Regions:
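Phosphate-binding loop of NTP-binding sites
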Residues: 2, 7-139, 145-156, 346, ...
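ATP-dependent carboxylate/acyl-activation modules
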Residues: 28, 235-239, 261, 265, ...
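A charged N-terminal "starter" segment
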Residues: 351-352, 362-405
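Acidic, Mg2+-coordinating active-site environments of NTP-dependent enzymes
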Residues: 1, 101-248, 270, 276-277, ...
């Protein structure tokens, strides 16, 4: 099929795919915080919902349709971020995402060189929400609030504020402690509180946006508080480390789902140091995936084979139960501790190793075990010897020669 514009064709195809789903879809835009809000919402919602989200920071004209294409029959909530760098870009992203819930994170300096004013940029971003049912935003940001009032949005305003009580979500107090921030709030006349394991202002604003979405979706304050307290920091990119025995480690031990696995495997294959070296995958059970395990891990096995993985190490009871699906060189362990005790990690040599696991499996200890240790070196300087050396060389100079240090 030949098309005039491959980009427009891709967007149109994703738009039609999106129209097949009648589920809550959260569209997230703003100058900063889009990926953090999306990933935190995933952490908050995924224990009880099948959530489809943008991989990493896929928020561009190409990234958005690729993200929306991941919606499938089992999807119950969609989380997609949209980023623009110049006027005229948001209409296409709105048509693809078609958000029912909008989140505007903040208005900052990013890409300001392509706009005549902050207000122009804000109005352009708000086009994402023209058909949304609900819009979450910070009422205390006067520029954003003013633009929202002038925008084409006709739905429910879910503003939050630390200053005004007449908003849907009033932040009554914020208490910053040594390693956490306690947020007390009033929603629908009821007082509640939650804490986040961060103390910076950006994390506070991002967490309140997540709080608003969860409240709108009907999550109880008690459930929100329990999940907010264990929010994990967002790893913005895959971490590459030098490993022992000539290995290269790709650490993605922050989350585990099918789509992010595909992206991580693609990343591994594109690395120039992968050529001619064995590709090894250490994977944990995929949690909160829903559906039959045989179907899920059958898809995983086919993906792993297609991506050229030559050695597979599976960790978890679910993977151990379906090990017959994996045809390449493979071994399986019911827990991370069992893998560590097996000694198999010490047999890996000159391989590119992708470490991909759900947080509960503590795969960070595997990365620590496999990483090349860097030992501290202490340099001691004998200043008396330095002075002696200086005086020695000065003795060869003429008396009128000056020195500069």
């Amino acid at each position: 099929l030949q098309v005039v514009s491959p980009l427009k064709a891709l967007q149109r195809l994703a738009e039609r795919h999106r129209e097949a789903f009648d589920i809550p879809v959260v569209g997230i835009t703003g100058s900063n915080g889009k990926t953090v809000v999306k990933e935190w919402l995933y952490q908050l919602l995924s224990p009880e919902k099948n959530v489809t989200r943008s991989p990493r920071s896929y928020n561009s004209q190409i990234g958005v349709p690729l993200s929306v294409w991941n919606l499938e029959e089992r999807s119950e909530v969609g989380l997609f971020e949209a980023g623009i760098s110049e006027p005229g870009e948001m209409e296409a992203l709105q048509s693809v995402i078609q958000p029912t819930i909008g989140v505007f994170t903040c208005l900052g300096d990013a890409h300001q060189e392509n706009f005549t004013s902050y207000e122009q940029k804000c109005m352009e971003k708000l086009k994402l929400f023209k058909d949304a049912k609900v819009l979450v935003y910070d009422m205390d940001d006067a520029r954003v609030a003013g633009c929202v009032n002038r925008s084409a949005f006709k739905g429910e305003y879910f503003a939050w504020s630390r200053q005004r009580r007449d908003v849907p979500l009033y932040i009554a107090s914020v208490e910053k402690r040594e390693a956490e921030t306690v947020v007390s709030y009033i929603y629908k006349g009821k007082e509640a509180a939650c804490s986040i394991p961060f103390i910076d202002e950006a994390s506070l604003a991002n967490s309140v946006s997540c709080l608003a979405v969860c409240l709108h979706l009907g999550m109880s304050p008690e459930t929100i508080a329990a999940r907010m307290a264990v929010l994990e920091p967002v790893a913005m990119r895959l971490e590459v480390k030098e490993g022992r025995s000539g290995c290269t480690l790709i650490n993605d031990s922050y989350n585990s789902d099918y789509n992010s696995l595909d992206i991580a495997l693609d990343f591994m294959n594109r690395r120039p140091d992968c050529a001619g070296r064995k590709r090894t995958l250490i994977l944990s059970d995929i949690e909160q995936a829903g559906g039959a395990p045989e179907d899920l891990y059958g898809r995983v096995a086919r993906l792993v084979a297609m991506r050229g993985v030559e050695k597979f190490i599976g960790v978890g009871p679910c993977l151990s139960a379906v090990q017959g699906l994996f045809g390449m060189e493979a071994c399986f362990y019911r827990s991370t501790d069992e893998l560590l005790g097996s000694g198999v990690l010490d047999t890996l040599h000159d391989e590119v190793i992708l470490i991909k696991g759900a947080r509960s499996f503590r795969f960070d200890v595997l990365t620590e075990h496999l990483a090349l240790k860097v030992h501290e070196t202490t340099l001691e300087v004998n200043l008396n010897a330095v002075v002696d050396n200086l005086n020695y060389y000065r003795s060869f100079m003429k008396s009128e020669t000056k020195m500069v240090c």
